[in-house]
Amino acid sequence: TPTDSYLLAFESSQNVTFFGQTYVPDSVRSSVAVKGQGNSIVANSNSSGAAFPVYLSARIFPSRSSYKFDIKQEGRHWIRLYFYPIPGNNLTSATFTVVTENFVLLNNFSFKSYNGSYLYKEYTVNVTSDILMLTFIPSNNSVAFVNAIEVVSLPDILISDQAQGVSPTGPFNGLSGRALETIYRLNMGGPLITPQNDTLGRTWENDVKYLHVNSSAVNVSVSTTSIMYKTAVTPEVAPHFVYSTAESMGDANVPDDNFNITWVFKVAPTFMYLIRLHFCDIVSTSMNTLVFNIFINTDLASGS
């Protein structure tokens, strides 16, 4: 159980269950304080488009407003933000910024391009004090809003301070001082994993739509009961459901050295990316027979 766990449904009149997690009205959490002025709105429960209960209510901020979360455990925390521009409140034209004390999470973000659809954002930040401030700043002639917020502590083992650089190559230090935004989290060869099946409340989507050539890969799966964790690895790193499925080469006997499985992701070119790969050999029939290379674009990330 996380030491810090805030799951808030803003302006909800009751607890809300969403993918197995319970969100409480923000008004009942005494350890969460708000600074600034905010109007509240509540969507009609029959509102078209708001298919999930966590999106049925929201708080609107006409001016700069902050939420203060009391933190018991310093270190990495999830910050998850849920947005849905509830019809009839002119929120589809909202443009605003969301910041912590040290990081900009959203910068002059506009909902005009989302055409009234949902928006979910997930970040991890290293909290180094007993308070986390989350501030919403409307742009000129606009408002800010939010439907739900999660602030949840996570184990330090999940993200180390060092990673292996690819371009340029070499060790990269200082991850603990950086904020990270989740862009993609995939369950290779397996179904969607929702938060109730992940001890850290993560969502893992199926990888098929990112495959460059669908026929290049085949799904492999085993029972989750057969998955064994080493001492340094726990289900918090990734749940059994992740390690019990995989994508394997469509034909491992192809003589062409260029045969591969490739996934393609759209990314913003101006950012640095942390890529985490999870492996559990559920394919080999004998020891030390699984040999392959990993490339990121044209750079060799890991060689056999």
Go through each PLM region and give its residues:
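Compositionally biased, intrinsically disordered or flexible polar/acidic segments
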Residues: 1-304
